[in-house]
Amino acid sequence: VADLYVFSFKKDNDEFITAQKYTELSGSTISFSTLSGEQRIFAIGNVDYDMFPGLSERLESWLGNNHPSKSDLTSLLAEVGGDKAVQFANTTSLVSGLWNNEDDTKDYCTVKVDGTLVEKGKIYLKRVAAKVTFKIEVADGREFKLKSYQVCEVPKKVNVWEGSTSEEIVSYSTQELTISKDEGFFTFYMPENIANGKEGCNSADDREKLSKGSLRNSPPEGRVFTYVDKPATYV
């Protein structure tokens, strides 16, 4: 984790308590100054990351006098910069997390007057953007040369917090991306937005079934999947 923003809110009325930023992190422990009492603690890390320009400015404004509400934070969207995010090769990824106790039954902590916690717990950080690798394997005696690929319906925005709801997510599709040498695999990066399918399907082939258009001859905007709502990312 290269940088970390931490926000604290009172449990009973969601009132803002404090926020701090950390830029020189080592190990897995930070020292956080807050008030005593029951509170929820949120953290966002690796904000200075090329995929989501503008997010750091938003969080920096919240460190000053422009304090966020809890709903401001939980509804926060990170917007992808440009249409080449899938090709970013940065090894760091935007992460977010909420303090939970050790057995994951409580999402708030109680800070005693002496600064120690009543409950044991941690802030569990989860990535907001995924690194996806496709590896092509063929049966014995068969041959397949990987020359190019296209990533369709890549989200332009992503919910920073897992499980939060947001406005309808706009998406884009890349141009055809060529592969200079045949290594049998390719890797791309994309924001994670999870949604359920329209209904269950009974076979692997059904996942690609189209009710409109074709994968080979139609542009992305001309395709409608039978079992999957837009925008579901596919390759």
What is the predicted role of each segment?
Residues 1-64, 131-235:
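Tryptophan-paired
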Residues 119-121, 134:
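Internal metal/ion-chelating core segments
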Residues 20-25, 50-119:
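Structured interaction patches on ligand/partner-binding surfaces of diverse proteins
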Residues 121-127:
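Short, solvent-exposed beta-strand/turn "edge" segments of beta-rich domains on protein surfaces
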